[in-house]
């Protein structure tokens, strides 16, 4: 009865406040995580709301289910709390932050604290440690062979790598390479051998197309294979192709990139590419390789990204079948090697969409060739089995033939089946006759299990092999050796077990036991030899810290699972303290056996007789709680016996509850303090990161300033070096001129007749040298004044930023420097003009010399006249170039005047404030660049004058050389005159004959032009029809997506692009006309030196062509009309049905949209209904029955 009264009293005490609160505004606030709550009087006193939530959902906790339970986290307030899953050994506690990251122990990393940091190993309850006693703890791994960090103290090797340090290739692989995802390359050997190594006879060879002179054999084709226009840029030294339509155009590689490219396996194919205009979305067929009936493709970049517009970027593709190389479809290893062995096509996409232009340059394929040079270790050298030979086992050995000739080197080699064991052709299998093999004696045809007796080849002897195995005789020792022993068996008589196997196949040491693989539980190195005893099978070279007959136990001082598949999970060091633990061993779970007086996970702590002083307060509090608990237990026992009044028991329980509340409140205060401290730490870290970013920005700014300064110094050094080279060239020219003997300008009077002319040329050369020195000095002074000008501008900026105006003295000084710079520029102009005048005088002297030579008595050689005319034209060209550069220099001089005006304007604006000072700095930089430009143009003018002087000197030498030829020509003058007269007659005849031929050619040309115009109109008509189809299709799509506005804008952009392209084409045509005109002039200059005999041959050829006049190609016109008819037929038969189908699809799509709208309306009505139900629910739900049962 008292117990019942207590329970009812508690229920009444809990329900009455709830009833009182129900009349106010207080309700259960559980953040949507609970439907149950209870009233707490103390909580009501503290917060004014006494409802405490019960049974919080979604792993939440707290008075209002406002936080996650210990060991759970969430990123946002309303999210479900997710488990932290912190590793119990590697984390400091089960808690984690809002992103799910746990707090790790020393040496541990990872979001879950489940991995060791690099250089650490053995994750235990104390964290990860580095055991100095173990050699493996150094993690001395070969970086080319590892696939991840060394967490367990042992190197984690790539799939094709082995060894304790991951420094060796597995059997069947070779060439350890850090760039290979597998680590090593699988032996190819055409599938005939699994043993190979890197060849030392090959060196690196790069197959390159850099397009320095022409297209280098490359072509451009449409997707259907039809040819497209490919152009070479002389300026940029690259090739490009354009497309007006959306069909892609591809660059096609020449023959040097095709054929047998086996030695390029695993290497890279790279090229520089950029696209201008058009679409810029990559496709799966951007790069295409074809060969041996196979075809693979790859995109330039991930399909989710966009190609950069107008930016040249290098794209690299690795030639292997690994998924990271992005080739599709993914071939097998041998399929990829078969493709490279007979590569028939390499295509790279050029255009993307309409009006697109693609540029490509520096196409490079890494290959190898058998010459000396940088080694190419990726080329293999195979160890061929019996019946094969060659570096790659690609040939059949003597006495063997192809099982299938159509497979080529991939086919299997089998023994020849010839009478008497004769040899045969390795490809066809045809047996050689006896006279073709005189060294092979006639032998008996022995069956399997027998061999020819070396002493008597006509007789057969049984093989000394059991089970009827075949055998052969070694030619060197005549020893009989058994062939084709079964797997796992070896020896001359197949009497031994092979490496990695054990047993006794003949029972020579006991009962017969067939050879079987050693059972070492994957705890031996498969690339090592002698892993087990060949007779007993006992494992001899256990690794991973294992031991035992079958490597199935951990070594002393280690624990774990020796049969685990992951090496990191196998046997690990016990890590016991040698002082506090029993002999260095541990239990199966890694726990150490401690000596008396020691404790801890590794027995590293000595036992303590009492707790530290910092625990005294806690101990006192715990003792008080224990006393109260004992009193409560006594009261409860008495209450059950009926000897203690319930009021006393109730009071004691309230005291206990109060004590518990105090503890909870103190814990909450501590938790709040920790949370506040964490927020302060986070804020400090944020500020630290901000400061670090600002510091990095400052460092980058300093580096950029240093780089600009270094670049400027390099430019100054280059200018000085060029001036020095020009001075040396002038000195060398002067020395050459002094050592040159020049013939006389008048009639020939002797070897010293041109002495005065040589002295005049020497004087001119000296004056040129002096002019160059003056120009150099003026250029240096201009550069120094430019530097001073920049420093003054910077001072003006600094003063303007501080006081808002410039000092008057600084302004005056700046103007003075400007005037002095202007005067130096004018003086530089005068020097250049004087140099031009001297060069012109030299030119006039040369013309006078030419006229004098042409007046030599008795000389009338036409070839000499032609040569003199060519040299005169060359001199005129050089003079024109000098005039042109003088005009450019005057233009630069006029720019200097503009610079003066702009600088004065900058000075005036600098007085108005800081913003105007910034403008002054920018324009001063512009002035500096123009001054440098003037200096470079002056240097260029000096360079041109030097070349003119050099050419004039060469001209004098050439005239002297022609003197001997002129004397020889005088002897042949009469004969040449006769030939010239005959040639003149024939020329007149040819001109008469050419009159009618020219008219016929003009008519043929007009007819061809009309045919081209007709074909152009046909193409325009077809394009118009296609455009109408596209407009119809776009109209159908516009009905669904509402893209009419975007479409019009795109048309405007396309029109603008078309106009730009037309302007570009016009510019290109003008450039081509200039180039063609220059080419024609050059050709005429070259043809001037052709002999009379060549002229006669040309006339004979012209007369022969006149006898075979051309005609208009009417068949081409008929063919064009037929194509037009077929195009119209195709439009009526295919395009119109397609338009109807698109209209039908649009109609169906509209119906589907109407159905979706109806469904959405229904769903919205259901949602509205649910909201009404939610609004009518009561604010709280109180389970009084559940309270009664507590």
UniProtKB/Swiss-Prot annotation:
Matching SUPFAM superfamilies: EGF/Laminin
Domain Laminin EGF-like intervals: 28-83, 84-130, 139-186, 187-196, 382-415, 416-462, 463-517, 518-573, 574-603
GO biological process annotation, one example: axon guidance
Stored Pfam families: EGF_laminin, Laminin_B
Record-linked CDD domains: EGF_Lam
UniProt keywords, alphabetically: Basement membrane, Cell adhesion, Coiled coil, Disulfide bond, Extracellular matrix, Glycoprotein, Heparin-binding, Laminin EGF-like domain, Proteoglycan, Repeat, Secreted, Signal
Laminin IV type A domain sequence ranges: 213-381
Keyword Nucleotidyltransferase (UniProt): no
InterPro entries given in the database record: EGF-like_dom, Laminin/Netrin_ECM, Laminin_IV, LE_dom
Principal location listed in the UniProt entry: secreted
Annotated region described as Domain II and I, given as residue ranges: 604-1190
Cellular location(s): Secreted, Extracellular space, Extracellular matrix, Basement membrane
Processing and modification events after translation: O-glycosylated; contains chondroitin sulfate (CS).
Cysteine pairings via disulfide bonds: 28-37, 30-53, 56-65, 68-81, 84-96, 86-102, 104-113, 116-128, 139-150, 141-155, 157-166, 169-184, 463-471, 465-482, 485-494, 497-515, 518-532, 520-539, 542-551, 554-571, 574-586, 576-592, 594-603
CC terms in the record's Gene Ontology section: basement membrane; extracellular region
Record-level Gene Ontology MF annotations: heparin binding
Residues annotated as signal peptide: 1-21
Sites where a glycan is attached: 342, 362, 803, 939, 1030
Coiled coil, from the record: 613-718, 809-1073, 1114-1190
Comment field on protein domains: The alpha-helical domains I and II are thought to interact with other laminin chains to form a coiled coil structure.
Function: Binding to cells via a high affinity receptor, laminin is thought to mediate the attachment, migration and organization of cells into tissues during embryonic development by interacting with other extracellular matrix components. Ladsin exerts cell-scattering activity toward a wide variety of cells, including epithelial, endothelial, and fibroblastic cells.
Self-association state and partner proteins as the record states: Laminin is a complex glycoprotein, consisting of three different polypeptide chains (alpha, beta, gamma), which are bound to each other by disulfide bonds into a cross-shaped molecule comprising one long and three short arms with globules at each end. Gamma-2 is a subunit of laminin-5 (laminin-332 or epiligrin/kalinin/nicein).
Further facts: Binds heparin.
Name recorded for this polypeptide: Laminin subunit gamma-2
Protein's organism: Equus caballus (Horse)
Organism classification: Eukaryota, Metazoa, Chordata, Craniata, Vertebrata
Gene symbol of the encoding locus: LAMC2
